[in-house]
Amino acid sequence: MARAAVLPPSRLSPTLPLLPLLLLLLQETGAQDVRVRVLPEVRGRLGGTVELPCHLLPPTTERVSQVTWQRLDGTVVAAFHPSFGVDFPNSQFSKDRLSFVRARPETNADLRDATLAFRGLRVEDEGNYTCEFATFPNGTRRGVTWLRVIAQPENHAEAQEVTIGPQSVAVARCVSTGGRPPARITWISSLGGEAKDTQEPGIQAGTVTIISRYSLVPVGRADGVKVTCRVEHESFEEPILLPVTLSVRYPPEVSISGYDDNWYLGRSEAILTCDVRSNPEPTDYDWSTTSGVFPASAVAQGSQLLVHSVDRMVNTTFICTATNAVGTGRAEQVILVRESPSTAGAGATGGIIGGIIAAIIATAVAGTGILICRQQRKEQRLQAADEEEELEGPPSYKPPTPKAKLEEPEMPSQLFTLGASEHSPVKTPYFDAGVSCADQEMPRYHELPTLEERSGPLLLGATGLGPSLLVPPGPNVVEGVSLSLEDEEEDDEEEDFLDKINPIYDALSYPSPSDSYQSKDFFVSRAMYV
């Protein structure tokens, strides 16, 4: 019986040992789809409130059995159980300061949003926190986030009053108090000094105070110069700039003004001024001369010396001495008294006035020229526009109508001499009013007969009864022909002139009487020639 109960190894199915392994792989594959989403870093201000987000993704049918928050060293900060609610086991992280944003102690609902809120953030709250979900049946899923506690510093800058000297000393100080992390301080200056920073604990635990001192060799020219303290911190959207005006104490630097090299005998109310630059301000002014003799007409009035009347005693060297808390400074001014006023100054003044007047006149002339040029250009543009309109439109010249032409007084015909007192016209002007000018074939140019042809035998008449008669030309005939040639030349010149004025006139021109005989059909028999 026992032997029959034991199956031989050869009858075992080869796939049975692989089934547990396959189920385990499928379970792990499904579990890998579930993850915890947290932020890698969260910053919170000291004394403020901050939230640490933590979410279980994606939404599944898995049941969350517990959620816990713990530090990197394993200290449990907060816990939530669907049945037992919220728990804060560490006294440092009490329920007065910590809370779950979505969870409620009275609810046993499934919790997939485990966001934890801190109130009254402390420096010791900074560190790594692990959000852990215990799920069934996939097990535990976790995410780690780093909480950083920062403190915004308070900043101010001030000048350090120093006295002029050969050694480098601190002339300005910039302080950034209570920063976490420490602030970074730099200086912006054109004086070429150097900065030195020191660090000390802040008022609150975990904060730092930075003190930066700007140093240089104090000189008089550094007094009143502005330098800038630049403070950078990650809690600032942009750096903070703090300007500082340096204060360097130095003795008076003195100069004298008011002498114009035109002090002459009899000049009244001449003034010398003692100009002083110092820190602090001078407390005393003293006027004297190098000769030790002070002119009776000169009166010292603080920083000014008033000379009521210039005399030969004023021809000396005046000294102004100024004193302040640091030291004393002095300056000298040589006075040269002239016998009479100098004209150099007047000439210079006149030159200046003349130059100003000349500049005004030149400006006025230039402005006038510009206005004239603009007006001329404007007129030229208007004239060009008018000419363009005239060219585009019909011609302005209108020739006389044929009717008006016919009504003009008839020109005398060319006469030819037949005898001593008889004259007969060869041809009269002809115009057909029924035919338009465009239909008539009018030659523009006419070939005139030569002088020999004009002076040859003349045609006196035509008859079919006998031969033509030849008549030798007499003196009157030759004279008439020459007059006819002159008239024809004048007519040709007039036609050319009219053609140049308006080409349309040529279409309405009429043949002149002098060449009318060329187009008329008649003949004279040879028997008529004399």
Curated annotation (Swiss-Prot):
Residues 153-247, 252-337 form the Ig-like C2-type domain. GO terms for biological process: acrosome assembly; cellular anatomical entity morphogenesis; cilium organization; coreceptor-mediated virion attachment to host cell; cytoskeleton organization; establishment of localization in cell; establishment of mitochondrion localization; fertilization. Gene3D superfamilies: Immunoglobulins. Disulfide bonds join 54-131, 174-229, 274-320. Residues 32-351 are extracellular. One of its GO terms (molecular function) is receptor ligand activity. SUPFAM superfamilies: Immunoglobulin (SSF48726). Residues 32-147 form the Ig-like V-type domain. The chain crosses the membrane at residues 352-372. Pfam families: C2-set_2, V-set. Can form trans-heterodimers with NECTIN3. Interacts with CD226 or with PVRIG; these interactions are competitive and have a differential functional outcome on T-cell activation, either positive or negative, respectively. Binds with low affinity to TIGIT. This is Nectin-2. It comes from Mus musculus.
